[in-house]
Swiss-Prot record:
Species this chain originates from: Triticum aestivum (Wheat)
Keyword Plastid: yes
Main location: plastid
Lineage, opening ranks: Eukaryota, Viridiplantae, Streptophyta, Embryophyta, Tracheophyta
Entry's Gene Ontology molecular function annotations: ATP binding; ATP-dependent protein folding chaperone
GO BP annotations listed: protein folding; protein refolding
One Pfam family linked to the record: Cpn60_TCP1
Protein name: RuBisCO large subunit-binding protein subunit alpha, chloroplastic
Length: 543
């Protein structure tokens, strides 16, 4: 049956939630800004030094279950922001903490939580429209380098590297990050492509921490057939199991018994396998599958040619040096051997492009040419120690995400300045709101927007209030640079954030805070006394 639950209402529930929110946001908040500190996580006895908000948030569990519910909400803010923008997680946590703190004060003094939430949402919506008007497009690799350096925690080297990688593969190219066997960090362009499909089942995941599938030197099966029964795939599975290498399947779909068989064999460790659905639709799907076949050197098993999956042999499989499958995309890095074929294919597509009249076709052809010829910029991350490697990989990951976000939606001044400037637009939005409590929601956002800049200043040992006042009086691009302790044009001095990151952090903070404020009750497991467990002797299996 269900375990005993503990229920708390109103004031008590919100106070406990808030305590959890504060604890977690404060632990994450110390890393904000160029003068932010690192946090040491002691996981399974090997300490890691981390400067990445979402990684810290994920590592914290609070002992009190009510407080942990609050912490879980901040974790949610960090994760959501990480998923949508890939960076800005710390900022989002700090914003959420402020909105929740101010919101709870208002609710305690009698404001209606639902109206507050409405006011918060209306204000944020208005500010995001303002942000879109203010964001300016990325110009050249100087901007890219600046965005990447800041996201990597003010690391110029990483910034230069990302800018270099994007120069090589273009803004539509693919960046892949792996660990290097040496101490050097390098950028190489390799043949490969990105496919807009993710794994069919999360059971295929090999890296649980990042929920991705990672294969090295995999064999590749490509078909436009639906695989449903066991008998279709058993012959192939038996052959590939003997090769002892991972198998990657691209098919119209895999369902029923066939999928169950793959998952069971994967979980039992008999064969490392993963599958994605074929990208695109109709005629174009065929074309894209042929492209993937060429990149991997596989034979495309087309059902109209009678090439059935159940008759497939190992010789018809392609190979890929590295495959990374995310929830919605897959990156494929080819064996060096398929280079000539890829180039021939690109030449053929360019010829088709010059001959077509259809705008739609030419767009799609151009996209395929870009995917095939752009290749994949592989950043091989080197470091002297495991701890340093992990920290550097997280920083490069952040920098990569921030850079693509900047290319997508433009850039704004960093250092929390964009939020402070946005706060000056709140009164105008508030004018359009009638309801008294909704207007309080607008006030809450106006105050909360100052928190990130204030914390960046405090982390640098400077009085936050003073900084905020100064930024407010200045132009949009001006702000406080905590690195140099000067007020200056942040865009010119390269302190810039992607508008997308600024937007997502605010939206996610507001959305989760709205949930907290409209919470009347929390139900959590009653903490049970932990039974004492006898430790197994060294070297013995614990059963």
């Amino acid at each position: 049956g269900a375990d005993a639950k503990e229920i708390a209402f109103d004031q008590k529930s919100r106070a406990a939630l808030q305590a959890g929110v504060e604890k977690l946001a404060n632990a994450v908040g110390v890393t904000l800004g160029p003068r932010g500190r690192n946090v040491v996580l002691d996981e399974y006895g090997n300490p890691k030094v981390v400067n990445d908000g979402v990684t810290i948030a994920r590592a914290i569990e609070l002992a009190n279950p009510m407080e942990n519910a609050g912490a879980a909400l901040i974790r949610e803010v960090a994760s959501k922001t990480n998923d949508s923008a890939g960076d800005g997680t710390t900022t989002a946590c700090v914003l959420a903490r402020e909105i929740i703190k101010l919101g709870i004060l208002s609710v305690t003094s009698g404001a209606n939580p639902v109206s507050l939430k409405k006011g918060i949402d209306k204000t944020v919506q208005g500010l995001i429209e303002e942000l879109e008007r203010k964001a300016r497009p990325v110009k050249g690799s100087g901007d890219i380098k600046a965005v990447a350096s800041i996201s990597a925690g003010n690391d110029e080297l990483i910034g230069a590297m990302i800018a270099d990688a994007i120069d090589k593969v273009g803004p539509d190219g693919v960046l892949s990050i792996e660990s290097s066997s040496s101490f050097e960090t390098t950028v190489d362009v390799e043949e490969g492509m990105e496919i807009d499909r993710g794994y069919i089942s999360p059971q295929f995941v090999t890296n649980l921490e990042k929920s991705i599938v990672e294969f090295e030197n995999a064999r590749v099966l490509i078909t436009d057939q639906k695989i449903t029964s066991i008998k279709e795939i058993i012959p192939l599975l038996e052959q590939t199991t003997q090769l002892r290498c991972p198998l990657f399947i691209v098919a119209e779909d895999i369902t029923g018994e066939a999928l169950a068989t793959l998952v069971v064999n994967k979980l039992r460790g008999i064969i490392n396998v993963a599958a994605i659905k074929a990208p695109s639709f109709g005629e174009r799907r065929k074309a894209v599958l042929q492209d993937i076949a060429i990149v991997t050197g596989a034979e495309y098993l087309a059902k109209d040619l009678g090439l059935l999956v159940e008759n497939a042999t190992v010789d018809q499989l392609g190979t890929a040096r590295k495959i990374t499958i995310h929830q919605t995309t897959t990156t494929l890095i080819a064996d060096a051997a398929s280079k000539d074929e890829i180039q021939a294919r690109v030449a053929q597509l360019k010829k088709e492009l010059s001959e077509t009249d259809s705008i739609y076709d030419s767009e799609k052809l151009a996209e395929r040419i870009a995917k095939l010829s752009g290749g994949v910029a592989v950043i091989k991350v080197g470091a002297t120690t495991e701890t340093e490697l992990e920290d550097r990989q997280l920083r490069i990951e952040d920098a990569k995400n921030a850079t693509f976000a900047a290319i997508e939606e433009g850039i704004v001044p960093g250092g929390g300045a964009a939020y402070v400037h946005l706060s000056t637009y709140v009164p105008a939005i508030k004018e359009t709101i009638e309801d008294h409590d909704e207007r309080l929601g607008a006030d809450i956002i106006q105050k909360a927007l100052q928190a990130p800049a204030s914390l960046i200043a405090n982390n640098a040992g400077v009085e936050g209030e003073v900084v905020i006042e100064k930024i407010k009086e200045s132009e949009w691009e001006m702000g406080y640079n905590a690195m140099t302790d000067k007020y200056e044009n942040l865009i010119e001095s390269g302190v810039i954030d992607p508008a997308k990151v600024t937007r997502c952090a605010l939206q996610n903070a507001a959305s989760v805070s709205g949930m907290v404020l409209t919470t009347q009750a929390i139900v959590v497991e009653k903490p049970k006394p932990k039974p004492k467990v006898a430790e197994p002797a060294e070297g013995q299996l614990s059963v």
